[in-house]
Swiss-Prot record:
It comes from Brucella canis (strain ATCC 23365 / NCTC 10854 / RM-666). One of its GO terms (molecular function) is thiamine pyrophosphate binding. This is 2-oxoglutarate dehydrogenase E1 component. E1 component of the 2-oxoglutarate dehydrogenase (OGDH) complex which catalyzes the decarboxylation of 2-oxoglutarate, the first step in the conversion of 2-oxoglutarate to succinyl-CoA and CO(2). The lineage of its organism: Bacteria, Pseudomonadati, Pseudomonadota, Alphaproteobacteria, Hyphomicrobiales. It catalyses: N(6)-[(R)-lipoyl]-L-lysyl-[protein] + 2-oxoglutarate + H(+) = N(6)-[(R)-S(8)-succinyldihydrolipoyl]-L-lysyl-[protein] + CO2. GO terms for biological process: glycolytic process; tricarboxylic acid cycle.
Amino acid sequence: MAKQEQAPDRANDVFALTSFLYGGNADYIEELYAKYEDDPNSVDPQWRDFFAKLGDNADDVKKNAEGPSWTRKNWPIAANGELVSALDGNWAEVEKHVADKLKGKAAKGEAKGAAGTPLTAEEITQAARDSVRAIMMIRAYRMRGHLHANLDPLGLAEKPNDYNELEPENYGFTPADYNRKIFIDNVLGLEYATVPEMLDILKRTYCGAIGVEFMHISDPAEKAWIQERIEGPDKKVAFTPEGKKAILSKLIEAEGFEQFIDVKYKGTKRFGLDGGESLIPALEQIVKRGGQMGLKEVVLGMAHRGRLNVLSQVMGKPHRAIFHEFKGGSYTPDDVEGSGDVKYHLGASSDREFDGNKVHLSLTANPSHLEIVNPVVMGKARAKQDLLVGRTRDDMVPLSERAKVLPLLLHGDAAFAGQGVVAECLGLSGLKGHRVAGTLHFIINNQIGFTTNPAFSRSSPYPSDVAKMIEAPIFHVNGDDPEAVVFAAKVATEFRMTFHKPVVIDMFCYRRFGHNEGDEPSFTQPLMYKAIRAHKTTVQLYGEKLIAEGLVTQDDIDRMKADWRQKLEGEFEAGQSYKPNKADWLDGAWAGLRTADNADEQRRGKTAVPVKTLKEIGKKLVEVPKDFHVHRTIQRFLDNRAKMMETGEGIDWATAESLAFGSLAVEGHPIRLSGQDVERGTFSQRHTVLYDQENQNRYIPLNNLQKGQAIYEAINSMLSEEAVLGYEYGYSLSDPRALVLWEAQFGDFANGAQVVFDQFISSGERKWLRMSGLVCLLPHGFEGQGPEHSSARLERYLQLCAEDNMQVANVTTPANYFHILRRQMKRDFRKPLIMMTPKSLLRHKRAISTLAELSGESSFHRLLWDDAQYNKDEGIKLQKDAKIRRVVLCSGKVYYDLYEEREKRGIDDVYLLRVEQLYPFPAKALINELSRFRHAEMVWCQEEPKNMGAWSFIDPYLEWVLAHIDAKHQRVRYAGRPAAASPATGLMSKHLAQLAAFLEDALG
């Protein structure tokens, strides 16, 4: 019998003694062998005996150990510490380290053998191997424990087939070893532990109601912090009696609110939180713990599920206001216009105080397009961080300062896994120009997407897996264990406030009813909904737990529910006659601004700048420090610009832009320009950030104009349109003093962010009363570069224009560009500006302005006259107005094509009139101009195909103007490219033929 018991032990010993022979250890053994060949005494005696028997050629061994000739020496650099060795599977290193520690302990008499005598060499080797096996088992729990955690409240999820990967037997331990104390060097907060003691901590930590994924993190400090925070005999999920009662109270509020609405408004859509009520106490914990750690503000973004609950129970929105909206009432005061939105899209803001720490909360309004609010929230948070710090220079804001504002995003499981903007936002999280010191992501994982099962909505085990790409820690938690959910929220908040990095909570829960309250989920998920109908609510389960603990009685719970219902009844009555008071959208940073209420008002703003100021700015724009080595081409660029400033003539597009930025910065307006390659400019035109050719140091002239100026930021963004544009829109919502610009690499690529244009930029003010002064610069122009580098799809933006919602412009002179940029900041309201910007005009000999056109009484012109009428020394002199036979109206670059062709042909009776601002349409100005030419033929000329460009938009406007002036020709004739499916041809010969054809049509 004794022999039989010894057999498994012997097998385990053999396994331990030969495990080094497995392929994964080959590199290590080769290195060890090379050491042995250099000096046999440098390795352990057992290795010495082993290598002595091999008898290999010493040179061959060294060569093999060194690896191929192209490998980099001493690379990769190894992280230090036995813990890290254990994490990367370098077990031989761990064994040596542990053996050394045990030898030291034995020498001091701290480590003794079974008989109480000092450890022998053999016992030290055995103890070290036990330690390694234990650490291997601990590592397995850290890596894979989450797969065995009790996460699904419904118990429908299949357990993975793990081949006993977490069993002690897998690591060479038998029940006979269970009473032996094993040295684990404080890895679980214990110096020595038995196998059962380890398992108790490991199962509780990694296989309970919380499953943690963190072993994909490469930073040892972050990894060690998580381990120390959750591992150990004293690290249980534990709450005080008061804490438990507070959790129960919030759960009763959350459940009671949903049930109350269900009774009062049967069948009305509310997208209830039923089944995910633990979210509410978790959000409270995030705000509370964050406030204790220095958090000042939380910017929330979330979808529809549970939104009304968050608004009322977390944000403190009066219940009577929500009931008023359910009744069909407006959420805005009577004197405020707006088209409105459904109640589960609306935003709100409030202040909450915990333990004397006041935290401001704001919930961002959003459309039904899932996850698109994420970048908007991040942008808002970034702007709030900048405002809090009060940035004046291009210095880095410490992440510890940024951490005072937290973006908190709530997601659905299917949307987090499915929507690409989620991955884009994760990609932004670590970038200098877009980081926000970590977003906290909370996934309400109800294990279904409308009617689609997870197996059909994602290819990964968890909805949160996409977050692993940025090494975010992920806390999976069972929503039916509110204490575990609140604990996970607490640890996640601490991680974010400590390391200023994103973190994810994935709360497994369920959706008690259909996608909305009029839906029947059993059509498509009969088994799931059978289980849900039989499943107790979170309040019932947690109430029973607290009753069992003797903390409350059933009567206490019933009384809490009744008191809450009574409060809601009172609010319901008040909601019948509720009237919203002053709306809050012009408070705080927006104080002093107003809503633009009259489309006919003067909207030019004071945009001119004195010549003296412009010259001072221009002088600074071309100065660089003495020891700064500028690229010689850039030096020529700066020299040319210096000449422009000296003479006041020949101001090109990029110079006008820099003067606009510089003058605004001097006046106290921060400039934030973001997009792909914006520092240099797609067309090598901007160069607002200079690089030293010897050490790559940066120098930004626009940040060195004068003391006390505002900051200029040019941010080369990641290669994304949707998230980056959403982010910049969000930034513009929080800081109306800042000129925020997003530039597309080519305007053609802007439609990658179409949702942001449609759902936010064009309609946000009408839906949610939220103004934005965002500028979108979209390079546009037909120059033979093919269908994807010609058109910003001007027609799309014009189609979105109505109700004075935004501005669309296609300007042709640097002066007008200067004024329209400054106009964004020089009025007491804000409107988005969509601008078609030039490519070939950046260096066109005619597309230049003078300093005089930027100063004095100059301003933005919505219409621009024919240069031949006002400029001296032109190739032709136009006839008097009465003799003009045709007026060709146009917008953008095509004006210069028409101008040069007319000059070439010597035509003097065709007038060219530019429409610089297409919306709001300058009807009155056009009436004034065109009344000069009542008898002339009217032509609209554009370079875009007929079904694109401004034609469809402008035709009815022009018809109205012609009727108004009683023109001889009541219809405008079209001249331009014929209708086309693709915006432009890819053949230069065809491009030139089309250009010649429509110029003939317009001028012939």
